From Swiss-Prot:
The gene is CYN. The active site is at 92, 95, 118. SMART domains: Cyanate_lyase. Catalyzes the reaction of cyanate with bicarbonate to produce ammonia and carbon dioxide. InterPro entries: Cyanase, Cyanate_lyase_C, Cyanate_lyase_C_sf, Lambda_DNA-bd_dom_sf. GO terms for biological process: cyanate catabolic process; response to salt stress. One of its GO terms (molecular function) is identical protein binding. This is Cyanate hydratase. It comes from Zea mays.
């Protein structure tokens, strides 16, 4: 597990590489074929860099050092500072999900059945669009695999020895 101080130091170095490049998360995403949110997750040590993505990320952020790449390829300790929920943009995102959550859940149930949206097999992006009134709008897309709840039949429980009935 990464100590929070070590993680913060690595994140600072990764964000410096982004700053030096002069590129946005969306710009780096366009060059790497990743989503802009995933690029941000990589640079914040919330996602693991995969080997096949290294060349594209190095090209997009040429000041990334070998040791940073090596660290990025290790499974991260996915966490956040508890005070982050008080940051206004994050607070409003949380508020929106909580406010619309019950309705979203009911629509998922109607459209798919009893289940949830995965946050593991998941894609997320943030886009800027012009609204009907000509003002900027934020589009946050959550694209997660549907996972149905399963009926828990003991015969499907592989950790149990096979029972023989007489």
């Amino acid at each position: 597990m990464e100590a929070s101080g070590e993680k913060a130091a690595v994140v600072r170095r990764l964000m410096e590489a982004k700053e030096v490049s002069g590129k946005t998360f969306s710009g780096i995403a366009a060059e790497t074929g990743l989503t802009n949110v995933y690029v941000a997750q990589l640079l914040r040590r919330q996602a693991q860099l995969k080997a096949d993505t290294v060349p594209a990320l190095r090209a997009a952020l040429p000041t990334l050092t070998d040791d940073l790449i090596e660290l990025m390829m290790q499974p991260p300790f996915r966490s956040y500072h508890p005070n982050i929920v008080h940051e206004p943009a994050i607070y409003r995102l949380n508020e929106a999900v909580m406010h619309f959550g019950e309705s979203i859940k009911e629509i998922i149930n109607e459209e798919f059945g009893d289940g949830i949206m995965s946050a593991i097999d998941f894609y997320c992006s943030v886009d800027k669009v012009e609204g009907a009134d000509g003002k900027d709008r934020v589009v946050v897309t959550f694209d997660g695999k549907y996972l149905p709840y399963t009926e828990q039949k003991s015969e499907h429980m592989m950790s149990r020895p096979t029972r023989k009935t007489s």
